[in-house]
Amino acid sequence: MSSTMEQYEQRTGGEFATAIDLAHLSRQTLGDRTLEREVLELFRRQARILLFRFEAVTCPSERAQIAHTLKGSARGVGAGRVAYAADELERAANAGEPTGKALAEVAEAVAEATSAIELRFGFDR
């Protein structure tokens, strides 16, 4: 392997490893790499859709449910930062508190995770 390729894999692998807990993902998929790819592609799509849905609704209970769904999805694939941020967003929505700051954190965490997934697997944005 060329040194350029090694550097690329180290850079993207490190970014992926911070966004997705690889050991957790492997346990969830029983080590099946094809299933890992499929699950991550579903998460990537769903996370973006849920962000748009959250912004589109105004009812606090609906917003909390959307955040809860994202939290569960993130936990399933090992996207810890997304799960933590979604938990904070769910809490704020349930409490009727402003959600702007929590939503910005979720959006940033989702962007980090989805970018890492796209880099690792070459998915189109």
Language model features: what each stretch is:
Residues 1-125:
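Two-component system phosphorelay core
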